Each structure stands twice: as structure tokens, then as C-alpha cells.
Design a protein with these regions (language model features):
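Extended alpha-helical interface modules used as scaffolds for assembling large macromolecular complexes
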Residues: 1-276
């Protein structure tokens, strides 16, 4: 088969075309195949593609609010941790024990969304690309014979194609993924990769910040806030769209008073804007 011949370095691939290799090409191909690349580096590149190209939002907008979230691939954090909600992708490199239904539902309970990537060749494509890049970096290519330089130039072009294939395969892997949030396996059938992640995050936010729906009307400007604080915006209790939210604030203040604890506006904001 073609895979067996490639594994034995008898043939090479250029795009969708396979060619028999010369002795020199076989030697270089063999050295590339024997080049070791770190799993963590591959996972890091997966994270760059997912969070840098496919889903590059740093915050998720729900209604009129923006919610920051931590970005992870397997057990590797991407970017700066916020300590709040988390969006995590599990790749082909993750341990199989992490992908059992029980483990996924248990791990996502609380404030995490987990996306178990579908079975596409994104990992193999990135690994092949990284082997070529590392091999070239370790060689003094300019001092090699022209024939070898030409071969390596072709390999570098192939590496770029592998990277493009990996990006496309990752999109497909998300579209065919399994989605979990707050302890539930979500049934998300429609939408592209970004839309499916959005649906997962929407479910997570609505369950983590379970009191968001208490707010019936947002104050969008400083003038609206001042009108409320000064009493200029008078609304009867029965018609107050925020009466449930106000009751939650009052309950918190009463509990603080019972404990004889001083409470600042910053305390109120911290309490009511953090994860319950």
C-alpha cells in the first residue's frame, strides 16, 4: 500500500501526488521521519490554530455582558488564566481515560466546557510538518549540495501544505466533536465550528451565571445609572423589570449586616459579578 511504501521511504508525497524517491531523497526522507518532535509542541500548535484562527474570542458575549474564559488544549493553558470559566479541547494526544462519558461529565461540572475533537488527521499533519521544520533547522542547508537544497526546499513547501491541511482538519474535528458543559453532554447538531462552540459557551454561561435572567433591563449609560441612584427614575415595584435582581442584592446586604461586616460597592460588585 502507499502508506507502507511511504513508511519505508520508497515514495514521497507532493500534495495528492505520490512519487518514487531517488536514493538522496530517500535518505533525507528517512532522516526527517526519524526526527523527534515533542507532543507538547504539537499541542501548542493546535492551540494556536484553534484560539488564534478558528475561535479567537477572548470573551464570550451573552446578552449585553462579556464573560472572560480560560483557554486550554488538553492540560495546557493557552494565554493568561482568568480563574473563571474554561473552554478546553481534548485532542488525539490526550489520555483515553479522560474521554470516558463519566469523566467528561464529571470534569465539566461547574464552570467548564469541554470539546472532544472528532477523528480527523490534524495531529498527524502537524506532526509531519514539525518534523520537517525541525530537521531543516538542525541542518546547515546553505552548505549542502544543490540537489539536497532542492529536495529540502520541496520538503518545506510540503510542510506548509501539511499546516494548511491541519487547520482544515481541525475545523472538521470541531464540527464532528462531542460537546460537554456543566456536567451535561450537549446535543449540538447544526452549525459550523464557531457556531457550535458558541452554543456550548452559551449553555455554560447561562448555567454558571444562573441569576443573569434576574436582570430585566440594563442601565446602558451613566445618565441611566444616575437616574436610578437619584430616584429620578421611579418605577412601581410590580412593574420594576429588575425587582428580582434588587431582591438578590438586598438579601446579600442583609446577610452582611447580620454578620456585622462592612460592605462596600466593590464588595457588592465582586459578589454579584463572580461565579456563584
Amino acid at each position: 500500500s502507499l502508506d507502507r511504501l511511504m513508511g519505508q521511504n520508497y515514495i514521497g508525497r507532493t500534495g495528492d501526488t505520490y512519487n518514487f524517491l531517488t536514493d538522496e531523497e530517500q535518505d533525507i526522507q528517512k532522516e526527517i521521519n526519524l526526527t523527534q518532535v515533542d507532543t507538547g509542541a504539537i499541542v501548542g500548535d493546535i492551540a494556536k490554530i484553534i484560539f488564534g484562527m478558528i475561535y479567537d474570542a477572548k470573551k464570550f458575549r451573552y446578552g449585553k455582558c462579556d464573560f472572560p474564559f480560560d483557554q486550554m488544549v488538553d492540560n495546557t493553558m493557552y494565554g493568561i488564566a482568568t480563574g473563571g470559566m474554561r473552554l478546553r479541547f481534548l485532542t488525539a494526544a490526550s489520555d483515553a481515560t479522560e474521554k470516558t462519558e463519566f469523566r467528561l461529565m464529571n470534569s465539566s461540572k461547574g464552570s467548564e466546557a469541554i470539546v472532544v475533537l472528532g477523528d480527523t488527521p490534524y495531529y498527524e499533519s502537524l506532526e509531519a510538518s514539525m518534523k520537517i521544520r525541525k530537521y531543516v533547522k538542525q541542518r546547515n542547508v546553505s552548505q549542502m549540495p544543490k540537489s539536497a537544497q532542492d529536495i529540502i526546499r520541496g520538503q518545506q513547501e510540503e510542510a506548509a501544505k501539511y499546516e494548511a491541511e491541519a487547520s482544515k482538519a481541525l475545523v472538521e474535528a470541531i464540527e464532528n466533536a462531542k460537546f460537554y458543559a456543566d456536567g451535561e453532554h450537549l446535543d449540538i447538531k447544526s452549525g459550523n465550528a464557531k457556531a457550535k462552540i458558541d452554543q456550548t459557551m452559551e449553555y455554560l454561561v447561562s448555567h454558571v451565571y444562573s441569576k443573569l435572567d434576574l436582570i430585566g433591563k440594563n442601565a446602558d449609560t451613566d445618565a441611566e445609572i444616575m437616574a436610578v441612584l437619584s430616584g429620578a427614575d421611579v418605577v412601581f415595584a410590580e412593574a420594576d423589570p429588575n425587582r428580582d435582581a434588587e431582591a438578590a442584592v438586598e438579601e446579600y446586604l442583609e446577610m452582611q449586616a447580620m454578620k456585622h461586616l462592612p460592605t462596600s460597592m466593590a464588595d457588592v460588585q465582586s459578589k454579584l459579578s463572580s461565579i456563584p
